[in-house]
Each structure stands twice: as structure tokens, then as C-alpha cells.
Amino acid sequence: MSHTPATRAELITLVRQWHQDSTPWIPSGQGTRLDWGPALDPDHAVLSCQHLNQVIDHAVDDLTITVEAGLPLVDLQRLLAAQGQWLPVDWPRGGEPTTTDRSDDESQSQAGTIGGLIARGLSGGLRQRHLGIRDQIIGIGLLRSDGTAAKAGGRVVKNVAGYDLMRLLCGSWGSLALITEVTLRVQPIRPAHAG
């Protein structure tokens, strides 16, 4: 069964209740990659964060953005492009939906959320030039399995205090904590030139 809380408060309440009831659950964004990895146990609840998809802060001049983890990557890129910026990451090939009855935007929005991208530690071909998603993360908000919220990192690029939990959570598949928000380093879109 899938649960999709509409607010962070609902999310915390639900996770705390599941912790008290010893209900097993698995985190999910849009659910596009639930078939990756081991088969889901029918007794496990699926916790979708797709409604937690807001921009929390966009410091255009500082080239950073903080978003909730349920924001689709395509929506993030569209929002950044309006400011002449982009996040230099892409999904690896083979994860896109195969149906042809969708427009490119709809197909890409089904490719996944920023939280799913980080939880899976996925990177496409852009990592060869711009590094992977783990190198773009400068801060992260998380929710432990007991419902305790925590944050690591910050909202500035030059942040070196504390443990590097961002790298630890990147690629953990949600097994260590549920990613609720993330602060990312973005780059300006370079002007195209002929030649």
C-alpha cells in the first residue's frame, strides 16, 4: 500500500506512527524505480514523497537552491533555466519510461525526483565533465526511521563543518534515512557558440 503525505508534518507523524507500530516501510519518490533491487515485500508500506515538491530557497547570486526531495528533476531544471542556471546532472540511460503516448516533458517528469536521484546515487553521462550528484550536494535534510528530523551540511558552498552525511546518504537507497530536502550547487548556463 502506498502513502503520500501532503506536508512535512504529515510525513513525520506517519513515520513516527509506523515506528511505534513496527510497520516496515520503504521510501519512494514517484515510484519509478521500485522494481530496482530486491522485490518489495507486500507487507511493506511505500512512502511516496512526490507531494513534497516545493522550492524552499533559491539564492540565484550564490548559485545554490534548496528544494524538497519530491521535486521532479525536469521541474528543477526548468525552474533553474528561467534564471539562466542548471544542475549539471542527468539520469542514466535505461531508467526512462518506454511508453510513447507521453510528451517529452511528461516522460522526463516520470524519470524521477531529485530525492530519488540522490538516494539511488545515479549519474548519467554528464558526470564525466561535471562530477556526479553527490558532488553537487551541499546540505541535506533527512528523517530517521523513528521520525526524528535532522539536517547536515548547510546552504553555502564553503561549508566544511561536521561529518559529510550528504555523501553517506547519496546511494544509500533510503536505507539510512529518508531524504526530505536538499541544497544543491548549481551552475550558470553557458552561452552557446558556433565553432
Feature map (PLM): residue ranges:
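N-terminal glycine-rich flavin-associated loop
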Residues: 1-25, 49-106, 117, 121-155, ...
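Glycine-rich beta-strand-to-loop/alpha-helix junction loops that act as flexible
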Residues: 26-33
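Generic hydrophobic alpha-helical membrane-span motif
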Residues: 35, 76, 121-122, 180, ...
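Short glycine-biased active-site loop of nucleotidyltransferases that positions the nucleotide triphosphate
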Residues: 35-41
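Conserved nucleotidyltransferase catalytic core and NTase-mimicking acidic/glycine-rich helix/loop elements
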Residues: 45
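Mobile "lid/hinge" segments at catalytic clefts and subdomain interfaces of large enzymes
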Residues: 139, 143-158, 163, 168-195
